[in-house]
Regions:
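Well-ordered, non-membrane alpha-helical segments in soluble/globular domains
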Residues: 45-52, 109-113, 185-188
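Feature marks short, highly hydrophobic, charge-poor N-terminal signal-anchor/signal peptide-like helices
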Residues: 1-13
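Juxtadomain coupling helices with adjacent low-complexity linkers
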Residues: 166-201
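Tryptophan-centric aromatic hotspots in well-structured domains and transmembrane helices
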Residues: 71, 78-102, 111-116, 153, ...
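Regulatory sensory and allosteric helical modules in signal-transduction proteins
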Residues: 87-147
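Intrinsically disordered, low-complexity terminal regulatory regions
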Residues: 10, 19-95
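A short, aliphatic-rich beta-strand micro-motif
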Residues: 150-159
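Short hydrophobic/aromatic beta-strand element in the GNAT-like acyltransferase core
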Residues: 12-15, 19, 23, 64, ...
Length: 201
């Protein structure tokens, strides 16, 4: 009689012990994994993006290259609706060129609605000469003049599922610079490649 119960006992023990053993092994392995340090990860991402924009500055002979990201900036009173803002998080400049990063922190999106909408719809803005009245500047002319920018090129950074998360800017302060379509496309590819680095920050 006992012999007929052996297969049942083995099946019960296997059914119970198997999943328990899997959980024990999984917990053991999870404890051995090094936890991801948030600060370490942020610094890693920052280095990747800083290296990328430094490369872009050198490759395209820009005087200032920067990356802005959209973020939440508090809430409207009394509706409680979220305020969309952007800040320049990364910047590299040539010697003798002023930084603009500290001037562009927590900026409400609606203050630059023309230019941001243009980036949202068409992915780039190309302004060869900010002083040329025939060129559309999308509300950026006075800001550019204030920061000594003669030519500016701006590129949307979007996620794979087309969410607009930020933008890349190239400023030419020492001379007007006209970039050809091949160069524009090349920089667009750089902006597209940034989406993975930025989205993980």
């Amino acid at each position: 009689m006992f012999e007929s119960l052996v297969p049942i006992i083995v099946a019960v023990l296997t059914g119970v012990a198997g999943p328990v053993l899997i959980v024990v092994i999984k917990n053991y392995l999870d404890k051995k994994k090094k936890p991801v340090d948030m600060v370490e990860k942020a610094l890693e991402v920052s280095k990747l993006i800083t290296d990328k924009i430094e490369h872009i500055k050198e490759e395209f002979q820009a005087d200032r290259v920067w990356v802005a990201q959209f973020h939440n900036g508090g809430h409207f009173y009394p509706t409680g609706r979220s305020i969309a803002k952007f800040s320049i998080f990364y910047e590299t400049v040539n010697s003798g060129v002023s930084s603009i990063q500290s001037n562009f922190q927590n900026i409400p999106v609606n203050l630059f609605s023309k230019s941001i909408n243009e980036l949202l719809e068409n992915d780039s803005i190309q302004i060869f000469d900010f002083k040329d009245e025939k060129i559309a500047t999308f509300g950026l002319k006075y800001i550019a003049e204030e920061h000594g920018c003669k030519s500016g090129y701006f590129f949307a950074i979007k996620t794979i599922d087309n969410k607009f998360i930020g933008f890349l800017g190239l400023d030419y302060t020492k001379r007007k610079t006209k970039l050809d379509i091949e160069t524009i496309n090349h920089i667009s590819n750089h902006a597209a490649a940034m989406r993975s680095e930025e989205h993980t920050s």
